[in-house]
């Protein structure tokens, strides 16, 4: 699971505070490896990273299979509440 976030991103803070910190979500993510991409600086490297994944900005969560291939249909773009995110995870 690759989580794109920025300190200035309000939706990222909401996702962290309300959704990703929820005990049910934490349990559902127990078997996932979480990597985070901090694009707070929004510099050339950050923009290149976003472009490489065809993203316009955070928040965005990407999921990969065991062969390190992105599951593009599983992308989460923008804020999702706990129930919606748990439902999404159940389909992976």
Describe every region a protein language model picked out:
Residues 30-35, 58:
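Loop/turn elements at helix/coil->beta-strand transitions in domains of secreted/extracellular proteins
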Residues 44-58:
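Structural alpha/beta surface segment adjacent to cysteine/selenocysteine redox centers
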Residues 11-30:
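Typically the conserved alpha-helix immediately C-terminal to a functionally engaged Cys/Sec
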Residues 1-2, 34, 61:
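Hydrophobic beta-strand anchors of alpha/beta hydrolase catalytic cores
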Residues 19-24, 56-92:
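Non-catalytic, surface beta->alpha helical segment in thiol-disulfide oxidoreductase systems
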Residues 1-9:
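Short active-site neighborhood of thiol/selenol oxidoreductases, capturing the structured segment around
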Residues 13-14, 47, 73-75:
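Short, solvent-exposed loop/turn and secondary-structure capping segments
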